[in-house]
A protein has these predicted regions:
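N-terminal alpha/beta PP-like core and its mobile active-site loop of ThDP/TPP-dependent enzymes
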Residues: 1-186
């Protein structure tokens, strides 16, 4: 259906696919992957009910500041908001629970938009991004020279600030020497 070209592209490029039985499981798996590895998780779901089923996992990642990308299918741009099969306002639904939610409007921008969505998952406070890719955008072929491909390493998200190692060492020393240590963290 709506995401068949993404599935085939992953297979053609040797990208491992973990197929699950339900879209909610896919979004929770992407969240879990990010929690376990520290790298953004990614799930790809079909349009309509596939995207709505994934909402809970995305909302969970949003509240917990977990970096993940959900890519959802959509009907063709020419049929968008005309009641076509599984045509729902995915971006509108995702905006309140993501850091970034957008539709890819041209095949030329696919790589750029995927890169942008991934970057946003780790920009400032971590959190999920949503990218909707319509069927006709996925079906179109363009020469590589027309594709907007971001330069590797040119753009990067800011990272979370970590405590100064010297301060951590001082705190550990104070706690280890205390008679009755108590730590209150918030």
């Amino acid at each position: 259906g709506h995401i068949f070209d993404i599935y085939n592209g992953c297979l053609n490029e040797g990208i491992k696919i973990i197929d699950v039985r339900h879209e909610e499981v896919a979004s929770h798996a992407a969240d879990g992957y990010a929690r376990m590895t520290g790298k953004p998780g990614c799930a790809v779901v079909t349009a309509g009910p596939g995207t709505t089923h994934a909402l809970t996992g995305v909302a969970n990642a949003f509240r917990a500041e977990i970096p993940m990308l959900l890519i959802g299918g959509q009907s063709s741009l020419t049929q968008h908001k005309m009641g076509s099969l599984q045509d729902l306002p995915h971006v509108d639904m995702m905006q309140p629970i993501t850091k970034f939610a957008a539709t890819v409007m041209s095949t030329e921008r696919c790589a750029d938009m995927v890169s942008m969505a991934f970057r946003e998952t780790r920009n400032g406070s971590f959190g999920p991004s949503f990218l909707e890719i319509p069927r006709d955008i996925l079906d179109s072929s363009i020469p590589m020279s027309k594709a907007v491909v971001p330069e590797t390493g040119k753009y990067s998200a800011s990272s979370k600030t970590l405590a100064d190692p010297v301060d951590v060492e001082k705190a550990a020393d104070i706690i280890s020497k205390a008679e009755r240590p108590c730590v209150l963290l918030g």
